[in-house]
Amino acid sequence: MTGRGDPARDMEAARAIARQAAALGGRAYYVGGFVRDRLLGRENTDVDIEVHGLTPSQLEEILDGLGGRLEMGASFGIYGLKGYGLDIAMPRRERAIGRGHRDFDVTVDPFLGTEQAARRRDFTINALMEDVLTGRVLDHFHGVRDLRRGVLRHVDDRTFPEDPLRVLRGAQFAARFGFTAAPETIALCRGIDLSALPPERVEGELRKALLQAERPSLFFETLRDM
């Protein structure tokens, strides 16, 4: 991710990108934890958007016209904007080709439908999308319902196990928000091998659980169940 700045400025930049994208027939959406935390009434300075319906060259031209693009991972369809903290991504498909959160085959698909784009997310509460211009929330996997009920539920039985770090992320989210993992998510996690996870990624999730959680003990309790 880019270095974070002022979220209000980043949202202004997001709207500028969205307006130009719309003029070309595309749409821009807030995605990920930013949408989740807005619906929870929590502050989140990590402004992330996903731009649909434009080619990479069209998006790059927009960003260059707004001050210059930062190629955070252009081959993966991920950009930044000079002077701002937001991340700008294009829709993509991901497929694990290695073990332990290390190797993924990534295919950028600018015209991927929003449901398919959201399907690569880990949990339903992180798969929400919000139209930057209209504020309309796209909820393909009942993430709003799970937010209201305090339930942590995985999005897809097939893609979720491809990244074993998601087990630790699940425990970390449960601790951070005081949520309860769904029984089917716990059952799925029990079959995932964590032995190949890089130590630094394990440490990162543990650190988040200890420093950001409402109840850090829930991290260990949830992990025990998983």
PLM features per residue range, with description:
Residues 1-226:
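Catalytic cores of the polymerase beta-like nucleotidyltransferase superfamily
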